[in-house]
Structures are given as structure tokens and as C-alpha cells.
From Swiss-Prot:
Classification of source organism: Bacteria, Pseudomonadati, Pseudomonadota, Betaproteobacteria, Burkholderiales
Family: Belongs to the Fmt family.
Enzyme class: transferase
The protein's name in its UniProt record: Methionyl-tRNA formyltransferase
Annotated GO MF terms: methionyl-tRNA formyltransferase activity
Superkingdom: Bacteria
PROSITE patterns per record: GART
Source organism per UniProt: Burkholderia cenocepacia (strain HI2424)
Role played: Attaches a formyl group to the free amino group of methionyl-tRNA(fMet). The formyl group appears to play a dual role in the initiator identity of N-formylmethionyl-tRNA by promoting its recognition by IF2 and preventing the misappropriation of this tRNA by the elongation apparatus.
EC numbers on record: 2.1.2.9
Keyword 4Fe-4S: no
Cellular component terms (Gene Ontology): cytosol
Length: 330
């Protein structure tokens, strides 16, 4: 089926690419795609296109990659050119998903039907850059995707629709991301169909209560503080997969931990200092925490691959009594 509603799309990572693909496959014309500039990535630090750019180029869509859309910012000339391109590209609505650039009011006012954002949380909880990570880290029982009519605030726009999903005990940011991306893609296509049919999308202002902010994940957060309870550390490991990983330092070597679960403690574990390895078995490496203990079942040494505990221990022996370093506390 083909549609007449013209969609400018703005997004960057895989989460956004899933939405762009759904919009395109549903038959909506996409006259322009905005995405962030190519960035150095990988071991060779070669310039790599975003997931959104790769999809757009493969399907013959026009792509623009302005470093900013703010005339008063660091790149005023590039911003002015991009805004002019938006003004001169015939379209009806803009869809934004994990774009990574701020949209000033001038840009929000250009599309006839405004700008719709796909956000990976149940707003107003987890506004901001890392909603999936923070939901897992906080131990939330559920999360979801919210469509909102954008305004100049940080994820403060009126809500059009949401989809809720449970967070499973073994969910990581990677697994939860994929389910949320699929839900976001489905929601936005349904919303665009209604917008084309009805000419408008009713929206409800966000409640003032329940607002939390999902700060961007920093590499410095990767270090595991063994003084924390085991269940908190298990959530941190899951939240930081695939980035930046949970890091445990032993004799100066940073070992990444990719899968872990709290375990019941006995007297030996309870008396061990936080960070102490109390068992190194094929089933997992058990480490004493501030409260309880953590069984680590997937590890990665520097320069190596993710390995199950059995394979990791075969090449990098660990022993009871060794102790992971405790990070400095601010």
C-alpha cells in the first residue's frame, strides 16, 4: 500500500533504523533523512555511517548530516543550510528517533503536522539519553515506548500513545532494545496511518509526577563497586550490555563481566571482604559483595572474546581468595 503523507525522518542508531525501515516498508514517502555525521569507530577508528544512513542509502533516500540544527551553536552555517533544506523539502510531518541533536523551536515549527518523537521509556519516567539502560539498572519491572508530540523541552512533549512491556530477569540493554525498537516501529506506522486519515493525532500532556532522567552512560560507570549489594551489581551488568560492560579489575587487568546473578550466601561468603573471589568453578565465579554474592557466568579478558566461565577459567585461571579492586568513591 502507498500513502500520501510525506515523512522527513531524523535518527541515528539501530533503534531509529528499525522505525525508518517500518515507515518505508509501509509505503510512506520519505523525501529526506537526517542523521548524525559519520563517526570514527572500531579498532581502526575508521569513519562509519550510522545505521539510519546505511538504510537510507541502500534504499535511495536523500540524506543530510548536519552537525547541528542550532543557528546559535558551534556550526551556525551548517545549521542554517540544514534548516533551509527542511523548509524547501516538501513534507507533512517529521519523525524523530534517537537522533542525538537538539531541535530548536524553529525546526519544530516547520512540518505542517509537527514533529513526533519515538522515545524508549514510559514517559515521564526516564526522559533523556539512556532510558533502556537506566530502567534495567533501577530494577524497573516494566518499561515501554512512548510517542510524543515534540516541544523544545527534553522529552517533555504531550504523549500520543505508549506500549508497555515487562522487563525479564535476564534482559540486557541489548535484548530489551530490540523488543522496544520493534514496538516503536509498529507504533509509529500506526500513528502515521491515523494522522493521514484524520489529519491530527490527539495527545495528552505528561503528568508532573514521576519524572526521572536517564543520564547518558559514561565509561567511568563501568567499574563494579563490590561494596554494593549483589542484586544491584547484577542489574548493572545487565544494563551495561552491550556498552560499556561491567568491569572488574584484578592485578591491574580490567576484566569485563557480561552475565551475572545474585546467589544465596553462607557463612564463608558473608565473612569475605567485598570483591573477594570465594569460588572459581566451571558454573561461575562467585564474588562476595557488600550484601550477598554474585555468580559471574560470562567474562572477557582484555583483548579477548566473551567466554562462558568454564572456557574463561581454562585460559585465565582465577582462584578463591583473589580480590577484585574496589573503585575510588567520589
Amino acid at each position: 500500500m502507498t500513502h500520501t503523507l510525506r515523512v522527513i525522518f531524523a535518527g541515528t542508531p539501530e533503534f531509529a533504523a528499525a522505525a525508518l525501515a517500518a515507515i518505508h516498508k509501509a509505503g510512506f514517502p520519505v523525501p529526506l533523512v537526517l542523521t548524525q555525521p559519520d563517526r570514527p569507530a572500531g579498532r581502526g577508528m575508521k569513519l562509519q555511517a550510522s545505521a539510519v544512513k546505511r538504510y537510507a542509502v541502500e534504499h535511495g533516500m536523500a540524506v543530510a548530516q548536519p552537525p547541528s540544527l542550532r543557528r546559535a551553536g558551534k556550526y551556525p552555517a551548517e545549521a542554517a543550510d540544514a534548516i533551509e533544506l527542511l523548509r524547501t523539502t516538501p513534507h507533512d510531518v517529521m519523525v524523530v528517533a534517537a537522533y542525538g541533536l537538539l531541535l530548536p523551536q524553529e525546526v519544530l515549527d516547520i512540518p505542517r503536522a509537527g514533529c513526533i518523537n519515538i522515545h524508549a521509556s514510559l514517559l515521564p519516567r526516564w526522559r533523556g539519553a539512556a532510558p533502556i539502560h537506566r530502567a534495567i539498572e533501577a530494577g524497573d519491572a516494566e518499561t515501554g515506548v512512548t510517542l510524543m508530540q515534540m516541544d523544545v523541552g527534553l522529552d517533555t512533549g504531550a504523549m500520543i500513545e505508549e506500549a508497555r512491556i515487562a522487563i525479564a530477569p535476564d534482559d540486557t540493554t541489548a535484548t530489551l532494545h530490540d523488543r522496544l525498537a520493534a514496538d516503536g516501529a509498529r507504533l509509529i506506522v500506526d500513528a502515521l496511518v491515523r494522522l493521514e486519515r484524520d489529519g491530527t493525532l490527539p495527545a495528552t500532556p505528561q503528568p508532573a509526577d514521576g519524572v526521572t532522567y536517564a543520564e547518558k552512560i559514561g565509561k567511568h560507570e563501568a567499574a563494579l563497586d563490590w561494596r554494593k549489594p549483589a542484586d544491584v551489581l547484577a542489574r548493572q551488568v545487565r544494563a551495561f550490555d552491550p556498552f560499556p560492560g561491567g568491569v572488574a579489575t584484578l592485578d591491574g587487568a580490567a576484566i569485563k563481566l557480561w552475565a551475572a546473578e545474585p546467589v544465596a550466601t553462607d557463612g564463608t561468603i558473608a565473612s569475605a571482604a567485598p570483591g573477594t573471589i570465594v569460588e572459581a568453578a566451571p558454573e561461575g565465579v562467585v564474588v562476595a559483595c557488600g550484601s550477598g554474592a554474585l555468580r559471574v557466568t560470562q567474562l572477557q579478558k582484555p583483548g579477548g572474546k566473551r567466554l562462558p566461565a568454564r572456557e574463561f577459567l581454562a585460559g585465565s585461571p582465577l582462584a578463591a581468595g583473589q580480590r577484585f579492586a574496589l573503585p575510588d568513591v567520589d
